[in-house]
Amino acid sequence: AGVEAEYVQIGATAMDEPCPYAVIIDRISHEVPYYRTYLKHAAIQGATVVNNPFMWTADDKFFEATLATKLGIASPKTVVLPNREYIPGIKHDESLRNLRYPLDWQGIIDYVGLPCVLKDALGGGWRDVYVCRSIDEVIHHYNGSGLLTMVLQEFVQWDHFVRCVALGQRDVLPIKYDPRERRYHVEHEHMSPELGSRVVEDSLKLVRALGYDMNSMEWAVRDGVPYAIDFMNPAPDMDIHSLTPHYFDWVVKAMADMTINLAKNPRPQVREAGWAQLFAGSRHGGAVPDGSSAPVPA
């Protein structure tokens, strides 16, 4: 295909150093801050980074809940909570003068309902996720959250669960998934045509708004309605033992096709902000201030 692939090699990067790569696939910068800093540099230098490091840096689960709501996609009721603890130097009577406290826990619970899910707004991999069945459970886990920013979310009592792998803002693979077992099921006709179409269309709407070329999203289906309960997974689990060999083969091929296409057909990322384009008209009369537009794949 005329494309070479290798592991990226970087270290002590200079500000004017060119990036030797056309495309970089990032699956680790959320754990290694230096990599994230380098990837923003690489994007400015002209590389296509999967996923866009500027969007990934700005993303969180509460933003995504707000985004889904604005896009008209069914999403569980969600509240972001003030941090339970703060770094040294934060003076509660000065630094937190803008914060309403104590929290109205009963009002919060009345909004999201019980049971509900308390989770880290920036978390993943099922870390710091708690299903709470009483207000006391919510407060208990919140009190143990430390410096994390937590969101409290309505628990959707689902009768069907789907996890989609979305690649290249074009291809979506909806897989039957059981979060209780944390296991995929190889069952190709697990949704009606109508439900399947809606899940795929809503998944594409979300990844195009976020500008993510590699993501997974979880849909809890209740009474035939798919609710987007988690779609902040820019480094999704792609292990063969998780996906099963059948779906793993699909993901590998789709990832390879996407990467080769991006190498041969570069797509500038520095000015991409898919979600901003969707809402530009609400404050600027339908036009982005400088008249620019971000490309959205067909």
State each model region's role:
Residues 1-50, 54-59, 63, 296-298:
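ATP-binding N-terminal substructure of ATP-dependent carboxylate-amine bond-forming enzymes
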Residues 146, 182-226, 250-291:
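A long amphipathic alpha-helix within ATP-dependent nucleotide-binding catalytic cores
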Residues 140-141, 151-153, 161-178, 227-232:
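Beta-strand scaffold of nucleotide-dependent catalytic cores
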Residues 7-8, 51, 77-80, 216:
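A structural preference for short, hydrophobic beta-strand core positions in alpha/beta folds
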Residues 21-25, 164-166, 225-240:
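A short beta-strand motif that forms the metal-chelation/ATP-contact edge
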Residues 182-188, 238-245:
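A short, polar/charged loop-to-alpha-helix boundary motif
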Residues 43-46, 54-161, 193, 197-201:
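Active-site nucleotide/adenylate-binding loops and adjacent lid/helix of ATP-dependent enzymes
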Residues 30-31, 56, 122-124, 157-158, ...:
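Short, solvent-exposed loop/turn segments at secondary-structure junctions
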